[in-house]
Amino acid sequence: MTSATKTNNSGSISSPIVVALDYANKDAALAFADQVSPQDCRLKVGKEMFTLYGPELIRDLHQRGFDVFLDLKFHDIPNTTARAVAAAAELGVWMVNVHASGGARMMSAAKEALLPYGAQAPLLIAVTVLTSMDSEDLRDIGITISPAEQAERLAKLTWDCGLDGVVCSAHEAVRLKQVCGEDFSLVTPGIRPQGSEAGDQRRIMTPEQAVAVGVDYMVIGRPITQSPDPEKTLREILASLTKVA
């Protein structure tokens, strides 16, 4: 029932960096993958690229030795979400996610769908509050508490459902580790090396700051993918993390 194209979920890759493959075409994405080492990072495939190129892109990245985070943020009725998560497991991805706001029944169904895969199941994480959202954005959709409070509420629900962790802002990391435990994985977008533009992220941190507050995996896109020398930039970020006490 497990995929033959699976790379690994054993933790043999120690890098906390997940590079977002936000490219307009597959050739550009694969050209980038050929410039960096799978020992230095994992790769994230999101909605745009997966919609355009589908499972073939995942297989191409697996053939190059990369672990893949399939970032599709499933949010649907429990049965549909469970089937989608199982389909991701069949692809052999390292990590897959759902929206925590889909509720406990949806998240529990997704978790149960991965049980037959045992140790080969992908990590299943939930999105709390998008890092592009601030308090005003939450008020617009009827949520009157702060992004941090909403993230904590949804993280607790995710933990109760037995998922492996959450996608959250690095600003919530310390509190979420306290609430959900050290083994609860925190995956954070909105990470920008010093001097990088914020782009469309509003709640950002540097890689060093993120590691210091307990982030397990940091998603970094344009600062690496648009670098003239992506591997050099990646290595520089990794080197900076070794200095974090």
Swiss-Prot record:
What is annotated as the active site? 73
Per the record, the pathway is: Pyrimidine metabolism; UMP biosynthesis via de novo pathway; UMP from orotate: step 2/2
Output one GO BP term. 'de novo' pyrimidine nucleobase biosynthetic process
Quaternary context? Homodimer.
Q: Which NCBIfam families match?
A: PRK00230.1, pyrF
Q: Sorted alphabetically, which HAMAP family does this protein's record hold?
A: OMPdecase_type1_B
Q: Which gene encodes it?
A: pyrF
Give UniProt keywords alphabetically: Decarboxylase, Lyase, Pyrimidine biosynthesis
Return the protein name.
Orotidine 5'-phosphate decarboxylase
Query: Which reaction(s) does the protein catalyse, per the Swiss-Prot or TrEMBL entry?
Result: orotidine 5'-phosphate + H(+) = UMP + CO2
Q: What does this protein do?
A: Catalyzes the decarboxylation of orotidine 5'-monophosphate (OMP) to uridine 5'-monophosphate (UMP).
Pfam name, any one: OMPdecase
Q: Which domain of life is it from?
A: Bacteria
Task: Name the family.
Answer: Belongs to the OMP decarboxylase family. Type 1 subfamily.
One GO CC term on file = cytosol
Q: Name one GO molecular function term.
A: orotidine-5'-phosphate decarboxylase activity
- The catalytic activity of this protein is classed by the Enzyme Commission as 4.1.1.23
